[in-house]
Structure formats: structure tokens, C-alpha cells
Amino acid sequence: MNRYFTRTILTVAGLLAGAAGACAHPHVWVTMQDELVYAPDGSLTGLRYSWTFDDMFSAFATQGIDAKKPGEFTREDLAPLAKENITSLKDFGYFTFVKANGKKLELKEPTDYYLDYNPKDTVLTLHFTVPFKTPIKTKDLNLEVYDPEYFVDFSFKDVKEPVTLSGAPSACKLTFSKPQDLTVAPGQQLGEAFFNQLSAADNWGAQFANKISVKCP
């Protein structure tokens, strides 16, 4: 099967692969706002994401979707696509790598998911919450969001607070960092031939991880 039919987070991956197959990775760009959600007892219950896709990919994704007003898609119009997105993301672990006190946390299937469309910027934003299988009180949480194969590029949204804590104990401290820019050695070409040799196990995209850390007493 074509690589890009299996390496997509939206149902239009085949179209995207055909249009961009000769180009280097990444093929999809996502800007995100992340929220870590706490219960009243101070336990961490899950992650709330808002991921905005680039305009080109959003255009592919909305092709063929009937809208009540041309060029304006409601949440109802986009509901089937949102469901497909969430189903596809499960295969990739929601591009989420999270540890508490050094131990990997298991994730449940997302809730409260929907897509919004911004007609001005012509982009889609996927909103969803990923609960932890077991809420946890932790002194040390580390979260990374990235695609191991770098098909998708994730970056924090350019706002004052791209990452927030919701309901966390007041003494908890949040820090986050962006990945460094990729440095390519002279003569090294990072086109499709290079990436076709990689698999998720190579974890090449880890160098582009957006890192979040929460320390609580």
C-alpha cells in the first residue's frame, strides 16, 4: 500500500500524497495549543488539544463536504471528518508521548472532539480531549508531541500561553520548549528517498518534539 495512505491523520491523505509525493517532509503543518487538565483533588486527568492544520491541507480535507453556505463549514458539516480524524489518530498514539515520574502513561480514546473552520484563514482546527487511563497525582510530568516519522510538523501556536494548566495545584510549575531548527550537513538531501528508509521505530522526528514539563511539590 502507498506509504501515505497509512501515514495520514485525515481522510484525504491520498490526495495530499499525490500532490506532494516528490517533496521533502513534512507534508502537514499543525500549530497547537495544549491544556493539561486536573481534577479538584489535584490529580491529572488528561490533555486538551486544539490543533490547527495548514491552509493547503485544510483545503484538501474540506473538498466534497456540503456546506449550508459556500466556503463556510459548521461543526455539524465537519462532524464526520472530525470522527475520521480521531479514528486515524489512534493508530499513531495521538502523537503524544507522556510520562509521570518516569513511567509512561496510558491514554484512553478522545472525548469532546469537533472541528472548527476559520473562513478568514481557510484553516481547520481539531479540538479534542485525551483522558489518561488512570488519573494520577505526580510530582514530575513530561509530555512531548511529535510525529516519529516527521510526516507531520507540530509547533506551538504563536500566542502568549500556548500551553496552560487547568485546575492544577497552585504550586505546580509549567515549562515548555520548542525544538531547535534542523541543521542539515552540506550535501545531505532530506527528500522522500531519505524518509522512505525510516520507520516509526527510528524515531527520527523526536528531534522536533515540542516538550512540556510540569513540576509539583
Feature names for model-found ranges:
Residues 56-136:
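Structured domain cores in non-transmembrane regions
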Residues 23-25, 37-46, 115-121, 202-205:
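Short, solvent-exposed beta-strand/turn "edge" segments of beta-rich domains on protein surfaces
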Residues 17-21:
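N-terminal signal peptide c-region/cleavage motif recognized by signal peptidases
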Residues 27-53, 57-59:
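Early extracytoplasmic/domain-onset interaction patches
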Residues 1-9:
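Bacterial N-terminal signal peptides that target proteins for export
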